[in-house]
Amino acid sequence: MASDIEIAQRATMERITKVAAEKLGIDDEHLEPYGHFKAKISLDYVDSLKDRPDGKLILVTAISPTPAGEGKTTTTVGLGDALNRIGKKASICLREPSLGPVFGMKGGAAGGGYAQVVPMEDINLHFTGDFSAIALATNLLAAMIDNHIHHGNELNIDVRRIAWKRVVDMNDRALRDITIALGGTANGFPRQDGFDIVVASEVMAIFCLANSIEDLKARLGAIVIGYTTDQKPVHARDLQANGAMAVLLKNALKPNLVQTLENNPAFIHGGPFANIAHGCNSVLATKTALKLSDYVVTEAGFGADLGAEKFIDIKCRKSGLRPQAVVIVATIRALKYHGGVELKELNTENLDALRKGLSNLERHINNIRNHYGLPVVVAINHFTADTAAEVDLLKKSVADLGAPIVVCRHWAEGGKGAEDLARVVVEMIDKVPSDFHFVYEDSASLWDKATAVATKLYGATKVTADAKVRNQIKKLEESGYGNFPICIAKTQYSFSTDAKLRGAPTGHDINIREVRLAAGAEFIVLVCGDVMTMPGLPKIPSATKIDLNEKGEVVGLF
């Protein structure tokens, strides 16, 4: 079978104006094309949709992944195409890929096989420039902080307690801890600093949670960049930075529209990581899709313990969105991985390891059903190495849990390979009522919120933290931030904070080692374990395989 990029480059794309008009009813005047196959949708048009009824929202999540990923994006695309094939008016909503993972381990993030979004190279490489705008807005604020200090520090900012970092959309471990403003007094006040990857930035989170330009500007102004020497918070609005930041973001905030290989609409907008941020595409894009479609399929990053938890406890809580069904993507290879099989042996049949690894899937199913009250269907993303015995064992085991299960072949067959999944999802939405609720209430203390997620979803015994972290949490509550939801930053490979603990571990502790206030995004980041907000490249980055051929075509994306 051809590679992902070969399939994408052979695709027959429709002009995006045609997709918008025929599939969504959007007139040309409301589109801002970026070439023939990408467009932004005007915010005036988005606002004009507010009184329309919403379609049905379907969340695609997954079991705890292997390092290779398990096909959430592929399944989201395949399910969206399948819904259209069975006569439903459906759109999909995805995050924009970050260049860090594209050039690092993933090599691309636009689906796979015959379940992709296109133009694939453009989507993976710069797209419409949204991430550049987000990085520029973040770095403008950083520059204004250091400039203010250099010119007398009227706000009395404590240079030891600046909480704002610069960002770049690249995996670059050398930038994690640096010293800036060296070289003499003309270059500013030297201090220790560092970079985050742009998808971990607060501006990215604000961008994805904002409902309008006005909301965006207010949230940017609420950012706490640090503290004064008498421990009072300093906001971006105190530096008069939020207006200029909003100017940089005003065009980026317009939702992006592209298409699948089967010429169905795809909204791709925003892209925070789910292990170190909240892991969902923009509220504006999701709400726009719901006004224009009967069914909207969206994904949340990594496993359900990270992406789905944050989709529900942060995005849904803040936006009023409510999913009607959840699809949990699982692969036989990942379940064997959770049963103890190493990566190089995952293509070999191993029923014992599969049985053992099923504990991971079972916990994710129970978490969604019991702690969020949502109906669940399991989608098995089929790989050619899966044996009949493994598929039969998995079907029986999931059936014993009382959840519907569908083997999907959208990677090889496109939407046709996910039609059975589409029918099951539609029937479940029609017949199985949801009892939607959150895993914690706004009124709970920050510590109790962390404890609820850790004990109910992760299988942990308790949450721990040293005295410094506990004191930070206490001060945040005293400052009026106790009603914010929490965003736990941890490894995606385990329910615990130890990536080596596979399956469904119990009896572990979740240790909070750092607390970050995201006052503009309106959540509190609790950093647990060894997770980094600036990743590094692997020993052999995907960048070594990405190139231009003699025709000027991109090769090596996958």
Swiss-Prot record:
Catalytic activity of the protein: (6S)-5,6,7,8-tetrahydrofolate + formate + ATP = (6R)-10-formyltetrahydrofolate + ADP + phosphate
Entry keyword Ligase: yes
EC code(s) of this entry: 6.3.4.3
SUPFAM superfamilies assigned: P-loop containing nucleoside triphosphate hydrolases
NCBIfam families reported for this sequence: PRK13505.1
Matches recorded under CDD domains: FTHFS
The protein's enzyme class: ligase
Residues that coordinate or bind ATP: T66, P67, A68, G69, E70, G71, K72, T73
Organism lineage string: Bacteria, Pseudomonadati, Pseudomonadota, Alphaproteobacteria, Hyphomicrobiales
Keywords of this entry: ATP-binding, Ligase, Nucleotide-binding, One-carbon metabolism
Domain of life: Bacteria
HAMAP family with a match to the protein in the record: FTHFS (MF_01543)
Name of this chain's protein: Formate--tetrahydrofolate ligase
Keyword ATP-binding part of the UniProt annotation: yes
Gene3D superfamilies: Domain 2, N(10)-formyltetrahydrofolate synthetase, Formyltetrahydrofolate synthetase, domain 3, P-loop containing nucleotide triphosphate hydrolases
Listed GO MF terms: ATP binding; formate-tetrahydrofolate ligase activity
GO biological process: tetrahydrofolate interconversion
Pathway(s) of this molecule: One-carbon metabolism; tetrahydrofolate interconversion
Similarity comment text for this entry: Belongs to the formate--tetrahydrofolate ligase family.
